[in-house]
Amino acid sequence: MPVITLPDGSQRHYDHAVSPMDVALDIGPGLAKACIAGRVNGELVDACDLIENDAQLSIITAKDEEGLEIIRHSCAHLLGHAIKQLWPHTKMAIGPVIDNGFYYDVDLDRTLTQEDVEALEKRMHELAEKNYDVIKKKVSWHEARETFANRGESYKVSILDENIAHDDKPGLYFHEEYVDMCRGPHVPNMRFCHHFKLMKTAGAYWRGDSNNKMLQRIYGTAWADKKALNAYLQRLEEAAKRDHRKIGKQLDLYHMQEEAPGMVFWHNDGWTIFRELEVFVRSKLKEYQYQEVKGPFMMDRVLWEKTGHWDNYKDAMFTTSSENREYCIKPMNCPGHVQIFNQGLKSYRDLPLRMAEFGSCHRNEPSGSLHGLMRVRGFTQDDAHIFCTEEQIRDEVNGCIRLVYDMYSTFGFEKIVVKLSTRPEKRIGSDEMWDRAEADLAVALEENNIPFEYQLGEGAFYGPKIEFTLYDCLDRAWQCGTVQLDFSLPSRLSASYVGEDNERKVPVMIHRAILGSMERFIGILTEEFAGFFPTWLAPVQVVIMNITDSQSEYVNELTQKLSNAGIRVKADLRNEKIGFKIREHTLRRVPYMLVCGDKEVESGKIAVRTRRGKDLGSMDVNEVIEKLQQEIRSRSLKQLEE
């Protein structure tokens, strides 16, 4: 009979099989009330599942991350329960957990309106407030198929036919008269599922295949308590205010249009930000001793076949043909960089060779996934590839890590989560090579005092990698930076160098990206700063305004003087009230507004205001220029007097 070992090392002995709920009840009624599920020998199980042998057990509650996921998954079933009551002929497809919530794909003979979604959410609350028990039943494959066939649930039948082995025993979860199929676990009672909200609907093809029927996807969010739900909704509200698409339109940065889906039309101010970002990255490339190169954006398909991209990536590649040759528009820069490396004989003395490019890449992303600057088809990578020997890996990775943190800190990103992905089952190279490569990455992180977690088996077949995920002011995660070792591509493309022993050797290639996509990073920055870009990045840094026509000449003189000092400045000489001008440029998020009246003309000074409404008073013009130059040169995140 089972001996149950708890996380604190204590043991409980039973003379019969017990469930996690039984053990929780044995410990105390408070824990039993909080028990959502159990973790038995590392595996999540339902609170009702029996433990027949000795086991390690953790009780899962709403305070655990897994508990919250289970709540969200059960809310998806609750959605199914409600929609079948409101529209009984609905066919249910899949309802998984996603970040911060869940969704369910449904086949419904009507297009859901906002009023329908509100009615659906209301019914979900009515059902949840009944606090009914969720009943789990393990059945044979044939019984599960018969259950769903009798209910007309063709999508569930399809899942059973195509994805579940006949000797498997699927789990059925009964919500009163509603039944769903799932691996589980799920909440034992609906009292855990009171804090949710339906968010939106969208179209989604069955199994993600555009040849299949378009279903309706209903998104929701769910949390353990009301406070967490409200905090999340508040973050969403703030995120909506910061939406880069909205701000991009307000500030006239860029636009997208149907004739070029996923391609950016940069306007003058947006392109100014893009170019300033390039200048910043270039300064770091110089500091860290990179070459900058430029490869063609289109190359023969034969090259992509050699690299393996054609076999694994062709659906995401744009192609064209000319003179009976097929070309691929590059989705990435690495093959082109190997071609540059291959020009001329290389010696070990030439290594490491650090090659960077602002590479214009294109990927045929599904149209439904396109999202402003965050998900595009045409983008620019701040890409680099380092060719080095195995002995140089650690030092080069060290340099990449320092560069990542150097650049992210410039934008004020302080919370960065780092993950090290290790060897997958299918891989090339010897275990010794992988041992050394993984150790090199780990030691480089440790030497920089960077905490990290392992993602076991998540590396590419050609090498391990480090991923850098930054968190913004709303605590949203953005995976941007990568340092990826590659033991395959140089060999596939015949890259070599002459070693100290005069023998030809294949270099190791390190793929390195920091911002990732320039377009996406500008989207991230737009939302991080809510359009209040730091002065060095702002498209227009200063606007000089007159109060009456008598100051126009002085304004023009000052405008020229600031422009000559390298400051992006505009004059506003319109015949409008000064309050109107200030409001307008404040809404345009211009960092500094300089106001000229008769007093300023007489004194040769200038009145300085910030976009946050702070009046810095009258200042000497040369002093203003000097302070602005210092702020811009240092790429400060703060404005004068902050």
Curated annotation (Swiss-Prot):
Q: A GO term (biological process) for this protein? A: threonyl-tRNA aminoacylation
Needed cofactors, names only, are: Zn(2+)
User: Into which family does the record put it?
Assistant: Belongs to the class-II aminoacyl-tRNA synthetase family.
The record's SUPFAM superfamilies line, in alphabetical order, gives: Class II aaRS ABD-related (SSF52954), Class II aaRS and biotin synthetases (SSF55681), TGS-like (SSF81271), ThrRS/AlaRS common domain (SSF55186)
Q: Does the record's keyword annotation contain Aminoacyl-tRNA synthetase? A: yes
Q: What is the name listed in the Swiss-Prot or TrEMBL entry for this protein?
A: Threonine--tRNA ligase
User: Keyword set for this entry?
Assistant: Acetylation, Aminoacyl-tRNA synthetase, ATP-binding, Cytoplasm, Ligase, Metal-binding, Nucleotide-binding, Protein biosynthesis, RNA-binding, tRNA-binding, Zinc
Compartment(s) where it occurs, according to its Swiss-Prot or TrEMBL record: Cytoplasm
Q: Which GO terms describe its molecular function?
A: ATP binding; metal ion binding; threonine-tRNA ligase activity; tRNA binding
What function is annotated for this protein?
Answer: Catalyzes the attachment of threonine to tRNA(Thr) in a two-step reaction: L-threonine is first activated by ATP to form Thr-AMP and then transferred to the acceptor end of tRNA(Thr). Also edits incorrectly charged L-seryl-tRNA(Thr).
4Fe-4S recorded as keyword: no
Q: Where does Zn(2+) bind?
A: 334, 385, 511
Per UniProt, the cofactor note for this protein states: Binds 1 zinc ion per subunit.
Question: Quaternary structure?
Answer: Homodimer.
Q: Which PANTHER family match?
A: THREONINE--TRNA LIGASE, CHLOROPLASTIC_MITOCHONDRIAL 2, THREONINE-TRNA LIGASE
- Which organism is this protein's natural source? Escherichia coli O157:H7
